[in-house]
């Protein structure tokens, strides 16, 4: 008499690249020793090629300290950083009519939008008034879109010349593309700028709560952060900085030297934002922000810097240990498929959640 059954065993997964062998052995049936040990074991090989890709969102805001409505932009920055500390980057371009002081202007940051102030864009996909609720919703929506490229960068001062910065950016695409049209771009931002007062439409709570500005006067002392100091290819990207043909997980390195403008007040407060422009869509595919350090120090935001969950395939479906967000599965050519009954092959898994978003490549054998 022959009896068969199916059951699942949850495995912790494998870490590291290479071949891994998992062996399962049946030791008892209904609490009794297995009388026939000729078929009580099975072995499966797992090929670990997992690469994590951290998606970061770039918010470009166009504003000015004399704009009475800008407190909502400041509040948006603060709340987005609090909600998404590892996945949110802000750049504030001061260009409010004719009221922007020369010391806050950044003519080389030549990307701009038309509209009323303040206004902003997230990844050049969503454009909106930066009321915090709008900003949080659009940042979350951009994170859920994920990315096809990981990005990291390192920035150091040129030895004996604090007015120049060496920058090296590294991109890793998760999918091969022979007709890619991507370009690197860079910006320098400065935090901690003082000596300005913010016109405040929220003074006394007349327009509701706005990040504490309701408790300040109609002209409030502020510290300006994320201020755009200079841009390098920010509008169209740097031509030929990324080849037309890209291979999956093959690092693409681009190095350049950035000249700092005279408006920079404190070199200890500057950061470099590197981002990748998708020329086909006119959007920003990914971004990273790093502090500028002295030569020999390290300030790098790694492609794999954000911890990502272990991935496993259980019962033909992808599961992620400890991750409570949404898992989406794609074939290697980018087609989304149902997360069930996965056969042998190579897949790309995208996880999107409130606190984390990631992309991993897996091989099911």
Positions of PLM-derived features:
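Local sequence-structure signature of Cys/Sec-based thiol-disulfide redox active-site neighborhoods
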Residues: 51-88
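Intrinsically disordered, low-complexity Pro/Gly/Ser/Thr-rich segments with frequent PxxP/GP/PP motifs
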Residues: 1-16
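Short, conserved sequence motifs used for protein processing/export or organelle targeting and
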Residues: 29-36, 86-296
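Terminal processing/anchoring signals of secreted or surface-associated proteins
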Residues: 67, 120, 297-304, 316, ...
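Short beta-strand elements
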Residues: 36-53, 283-297, 362-364
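C-terminal tail/sorting-segment detector
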Residues: 344-365
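Short glycine/proline/serine/threonine-rich loop/turn segments at secondary-structure transition edges
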Residues: 13-23, 262-270
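Residue-level detector of functionally pivotal "anchor" positions at catalytic/ligand-binding pockets or at interdomain
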Residues: 49-57, 291-325
């Amino acid at each position: 008499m022959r009896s068969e059954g199916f059951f699942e065993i949850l495995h912790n997964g494998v870490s590291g690249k290479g071949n891994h062998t998992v062996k399962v052995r049946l030791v008892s049936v209904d609490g009794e020793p297995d009388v026939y040990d000729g078929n009580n074991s099975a072995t499966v090989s797992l090929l670990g090629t997992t690469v994590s890709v951290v998606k970061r969102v770039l918010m470009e805001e166009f504003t000015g300290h004399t704009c009475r409505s800008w407190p909502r932009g400041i509040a948006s920055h603060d709340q987005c950083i609090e909600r998404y500390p590892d996945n949110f980057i802000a750049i504030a371009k001061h260009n409010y009519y004719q009221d922007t002081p020369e010391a806050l202007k950044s003519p080389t940051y030549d990307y701009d939008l038309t509209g009323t102030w303040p206004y902003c864009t997230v990844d050049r996909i969503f454009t909106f008034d930066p009321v915090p609720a709008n900003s949080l919703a659009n940042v979350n929506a951009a994170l859920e879109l994920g990315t096809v490229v990981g990005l990291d960068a390192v920035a150091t001062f040129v030895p004996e010349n604090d007015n120049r910065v060496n920058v090296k950016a590294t991109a890793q695409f998760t999918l091969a593309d022979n007709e890619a049209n991507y370009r690197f771009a860079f910006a320098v931002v400065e935090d901690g700028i003082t000596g300005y007062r913010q016109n405040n439409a929220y003074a006394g709570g007349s327009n509701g709560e706005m990040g504490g500005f309701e408790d300040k006067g109609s002209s409030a002392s502020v510290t300006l952060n994320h201020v755009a100091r200079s841009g390098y290819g920010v509008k169209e990207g740097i031509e030929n900085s990324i080849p037309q043909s890209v291979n999956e997980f093959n690092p693409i390195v681009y190095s350049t030297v950035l000249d700092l403008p005279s408006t920079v007040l404190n070199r200890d407060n500057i950061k470099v934002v590197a981002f990748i422009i998708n020329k086909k869509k006119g959007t920003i595919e990914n971004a990273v922000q790093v502090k500028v350090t002295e030569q020999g120090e390290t300030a790098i935001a790694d492609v794999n810097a954000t911890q990502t969950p272990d991935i496993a395939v259980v019962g033909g479906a992808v599961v992620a240990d400890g991750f409570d967000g949404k898992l989406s599965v794609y074939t290697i050519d980018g087609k989304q498929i149902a997360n069930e009954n996965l056969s042998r092959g190579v897949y790309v898994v995208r996880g999107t959640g409130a606190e984390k978003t990631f992309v991993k490549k897996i091989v099911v054998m």
